[in-house]
Amino acid sequence: MPRRRGIGHRKILSDPKFSSEMVAKLINIIMVDGKKSIAEEIVYQALTMLAKKIGKPELEVLELALENVRPTVEVKSRRVGGSTYQVPIEVRPVRRHALAMRWIVHSARKRIDKSMIIRLSNELSDAIENKGSAVKKREDVHRMAEANKAFAHYRW
């Protein structure tokens, strides 16, 4: 089989409520054991709760939170002559979105609030205010890239 062409990305259908691909991806990340309707309920209620609290539309609130968590650079291991270097590379836009959503959901799951709706809402709220563990994760990744700036010439 020839391997000339790269694989095209699978198109994700937008969600029913907001017709947004971004919300659909968040729902898919939240989903556990294929229970999409529960994941949709969690995301929609968390966004509605946060939108009421802040006083802005749901999609705008989500975009604000993601903007503050998106990484611009990350490090990748590169083996050169027997030793491994952490080489800083720029993150592609699609991966930025994916990482930001993954970090927010992971941080929300680690919280100790009553329900996932409240945990997700609080984590998004913290992300908007530039605090919380998802923002801390982005800062750690940026700090790591900054510390390894000397190895940037090993980029490929």
Swiss-Prot record:
Any Pfam family matching the protein: Ribosomal_S7
InterPro entries assigned: Ribosomal_uS7, Ribosomal_uS7_bac/org-type, Ribosomal_uS7_CS, Ribosomal_uS7_dom, Ribosomal_uS7_dom_sf
GO cellular component, one term: small ribosomal subunit
A biological process from GO: translation
Xref: CDD domains: uS7_Bacteria (cd14869)
Superkingdom of origin: Bacteria
Protein family according to the UniProt entry: Belongs to the universal ribosomal protein uS7 family.
Protein function: One of the primary rRNA binding proteins, it binds directly to 16S rRNA where it nucleates assembly of the head domain of the 30S subunit. Is located at the subunit interface close to the decoding center, probably blocks exit of the E-site tRNA.
Name the UniProt record assigns to this protein: Small ribosomal subunit protein uS7
